[in-house]
Each structure stands twice: as structure tokens, then as C-alpha cells.
């Protein structure tokens, strides 16, 4: 379980319609719901605000969470989507890092004292994905309440990780481990979670097709993920069955 997820749930139990937890933390919650170990540690919560539902009260509660956790690093990027990063809480019950995305301008209370932040390739990729209307629609379609937390369901996490993988592969000077992380998460989800077929927006579906065409994993890499008896072609076929049929 992601450190601090319980206290996050406690603070935001009345606001599950106003955000979605995505990324590795969402995977971890989904796996925990099924009493399965996700297989990798994630220290941060990636949160997307639902712009149609957000309220002043959510902003007030969010900032209370930051104050109560006594986060020592508080930063904000320029441009859209808005991106906030809160890191190194003094209260160890709180998540180690929170990354908050908003598609449109959303003024958090008490923004004085936020330092400018330069976003890295992985954040830049996710920001671009969230600005895309088709992916935002998929985000809304794929959310579910698990353990009192609004999360992106496993079968809907995969298209986002596939798009991030495609984007990072096109960039130069990107750490290969960042690229493999998304692919490996997809493999873990397919191997361990019961998944439903998804009807994706056309653009998302086309990108899934591109990902499947480019997907490859060696037998040795699968063994390192503790997955045996499965080949690369088996994974590609499973993805086709869920997203393309």
C-alpha cells in the first residue's frame, strides 16, 4: 500500500467526485482491493482534478491537508495544465509526495510561497495527455471508488500508460527505466487483475493499436517480473482482446 493513502482517504472521503488518483498509486489501490501485491513501490500520489465538479471547499480541504502534513517543498509550474508538487512532509503519516494536475486554471488558497518548478519529461508527457480531450473523457469514463478513494480502474490505467510509453520513446535522452516502468506496469496489471473490455475514444484506441504493434518484452524480462509461461505475443493478444475487438 502507498504510504499515506489512508490519511488521504480520511481527508477527502467527501470529495471523491472532484479528483481521480492515477498512475502507480492507483495501481497499488486496485491491487490492494484484490489482496494482491502490486510488485513495485510508489511514493507519490498523482491526482487529477475533475474540472467540472471542483468546488471551493475541495480547495480549502486540500490546502488543510498540505498544512497539516507540513510539506516542506511546495512548487507550481507555469502554463497549462497547472501542475503542483508537494514534497517532504514533516508528518510521516502523510504521502511522501503529491503531484496535482488541473486542466484549467485553478487557484489554490495560500499560493504565496509556492516556488516555480521545471517539469521533467514524465510530467510533461502526462500534462500533454491530460490536455487531450479524448484522454480526459477516458479519465472520466474509467474512474471508480475503491477503498473510499476515487481511482482510475486498472483497465483504464493501461491506455494512459501506453500513451506515456509512446511519448517517452519518441524523446531523446530519456532514462530507459522510465520507459520500461510504464510497460512493466501494464504487464503486471494484465497478469494479475481481472479486466473488463473497454470501449475507448477513437484517438485513444488508435494509440493503443500503435502501442500493441510496438510492444515487446523478452522472456528474461518477464521472469524478472515473476511472470512465467507467458510470451510477448500472449500479452499483445490480451491487449487486442480488451481494447481492439
Residue ranges and their predicted role:
Residues 1-245:
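Compositionally biased terminal segments of proteins
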Amino acid at each position: 500500500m502507498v504510504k499515506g493513502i489512508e490519511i488521504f482517504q480520511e481527508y477527502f472521503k467527501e470529495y471523491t467526485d472532484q479528483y481521480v488518483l492515477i498512475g502507480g498509486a492507483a495501481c497499488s489501490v486496485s491491487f490492494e482491493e484484490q489482496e494482491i501485491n502490486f510488485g513495485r513501490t510508489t511514493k507519490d500520489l498523482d491526482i487529477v482534478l475533475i474540472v467540472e465538479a471542483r468546488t471551493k471547499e475541495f480547495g480549502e480541504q486540500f490546502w488543510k491537508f498540505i498544512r497539516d502534513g507540513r510539506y516542506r517543498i511546495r512548487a507550481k509550474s507555469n502554463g497549462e495544465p497547472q501542475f503542483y508538487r508537494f514534497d517532504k512532509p514533516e508528518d510521516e503519516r502523510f504521502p511522501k509526495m503529491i503531484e496535482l494536475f488541473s486542466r484549467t486554471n485553478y487557484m489554490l488558497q495560500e499560493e504565496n510561497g509556492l516556488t516555480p518548478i521545471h517539469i521533467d519529461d514524465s510530467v510533461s508527457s502526462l500534462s500533454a495527455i491530460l490536455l487531450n480531450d479524448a484522454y480526459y473523457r477516458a479519465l472520466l469514463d474509467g474512474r471508480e471508488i475503491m477503498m473510499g478513494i476515487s481511482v482510475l480502474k486498472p483497465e483504464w490505467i493501461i491506455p494512459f500508460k501506453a500513451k506515456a510509453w509512446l511519448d517517452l520513446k519518441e524523446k531523446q535522452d530519456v532514462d530507459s527505466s522510465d520507459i520500461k516502468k510504464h510497460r512493466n506496469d501494464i504487464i503486471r496489471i494484465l497478469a494479475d487483475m481481472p479486466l473488463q473490455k473497454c470501449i475507448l475514444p477513437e484517438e485513444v484506441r488508435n494509440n493503443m493499436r500503435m502501442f500493441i504493434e510496438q510492444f515487446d518484452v523478452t522472456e528474461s524480462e518477464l521472469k524478472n517480473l515473476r511472470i512465467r509461461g507467458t510470451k510477448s505475443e500472449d500479452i499483445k493478444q490480451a491487449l487486442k482482446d480488451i481494447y481492439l475487438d
